[in-house]
Amino acid sequence: MTKRIITISREFGSGGRFIGEEVAKKLGISYYDKDIIGQIAEQSGFAPEYIRENAELSPKKGLFAYAFSGRDITGKSVEDMVYEAQRNVILKIAEKESCVIIGRNADFILKDREDVLNVFIHGDMPKKVQRICKLYNVAEADAAKMITETDKRRRTNYNFYTDQKWGMAKNYTLSLNSSQLGYERCGEIIMECVK
């Protein structure tokens, strides 16, 4: 297999992280998800805990609050500095090796590369709620709230930094419904596309 980069954007609870990890294992390529946080922290100078809480989900207080957030002398906000560090780390990883990258707007950051397969994993709300209840041991109402809030923050971040619409099929090579296809079949389809 020639070098391939697979980016997986996903709705919370759709199993995108699990699917990506399985694809990476089966293809024998690197997998980048939360472990990328250390590299982003090093590049940005912010603590890993701050990156973990804010990188993928900022601007977390909305665009109005973002407009009034602190800035450095170049006019960049803290969120912008974290995003720039994240972008640089993703570009370096893509240059280095075949891999699966979960989230972090990697699909947009790498969109001009010919060796990239951009995937969006989504699912039906009842199945996502069921998965989150099981993973986090929470009630259905709490799971639904977690899904709605996490996806809203991901959407805000993506739409702000990319000028594209998060989850819109035309922004991805593949858009797969894990509730209808199942996690295993989603993984098989992704692997068929990179052969």
Language model: regions and residue ranges:
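Small-molecule kinase domains that catalyze NTP-dependent phosphoryl transfer to phosphate-bearing small molecules
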Residues: 59-66, 139-184
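Conserved phosphate-donor/acceptor-positioning beta-strand/loop module used by diverse small-molecule
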Residues: 112-134, 140-148
